[in-house]
Structures are given as C-alpha cells and as structure tokens.
C-alpha cells in the first residue's frame, strides 16, 4: 500500500574536516549536510531523530534526540529543510543511517528513512 500523504525524501552530502581531526589520536571529524524534502500531500513536522553510526571497525553507536540542530521544523508539501551537523569517528571510514520521526498535520505519525551513507577520509577508499 502506498501512502502518498506522507512521503519524505532524505539526501545527505558529507565532507571530511581535516582542521578538526587528529589522525594520530584516531580522531576523524566529518560534516554532513542533510536535505529533507516533503514529497507528500500534507505538512510534516520533524519531531526526533535516530542515528546508527558505525566506524570502520564495526563499532556502532546509537543517537536519539529531539529535532535536528535544536529545531523541529515544519516542512510544507514540496518544500525542503536543510541543515548541517557533524560526527567524529575513531577510524578513517564509517557510515551512518537512521530515521526521522515525523508527524503529519493530519495527526498521523510516520518514520522517514535516512539511507546509509559513507564517511571517508579522502583516499581512504579505493
């Protein structure tokens, strides 16, 4: 069954932050810019987030919290919300995935999937 009222697309761009990293201390900092597009038929508010962060050694960390960067944006149909945040890994490569918990203006709660994306120091992947 397709729910055309509640469709959210999530895109992520990443970059390595050498100025905030300390490779000799196994500290690799990354920024990620997320674009959340409401492709549904009703306004939707982002209430909370759930991230699963995995480093290159397979260690995982789960992060849950209200909103994103201090906001719980209401996204109109056809509109986008973009924000930038960051994370630090102990390895040169890793990945993130997760979901946003959304609430449609019709009172229906739903999850918007965040597809897995890679974090990698330039040249770390062949």
From Swiss-Prot:
Residues 2-126 form the ApaG domain. HAMAP family: ApaG (MF_00791). It comes from the Bacteria. PROSITE patterns: APAG (PS51087). The gene is apaG. Pfam families: DUF525. This is Protein ApaG. GO terms for biological process: error-free translesion synthesis. It comes from Pseudomonas aeruginosa (strain ATCC 15692 / DSM 22644 / CIP 104116 / JCM 14847 / LMG 12228 / 1C / PRS 101 / PAO1).
């Amino acid at each position: 069954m397709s729910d055309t009222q509640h469709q959210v697309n999530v895109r992520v761009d990443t970059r390595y932050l050498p100025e905030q990293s300390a490779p000799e201390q196994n500290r690799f900092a990354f920024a990620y810019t997320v674009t959340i597009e409401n492709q549904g038929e009703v306004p939707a508010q982002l209430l909370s987030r759930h991230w699963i962060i995995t480093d290159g050694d397979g260690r995982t960390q789960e992060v849950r919290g209200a909103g994103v960067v201090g906001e719980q944006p209401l996204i109109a149909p056809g509109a986008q919300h973009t924000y930038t945040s960051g994370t630090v890994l102990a390895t040169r490569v890793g990945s993130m995935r997760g979901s946003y918990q959304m609430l449609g203006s019709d009172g229906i709660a739903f999850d918007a999937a965040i597809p897995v994306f890679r974090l990698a120091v330039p040249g770390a992947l062949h």
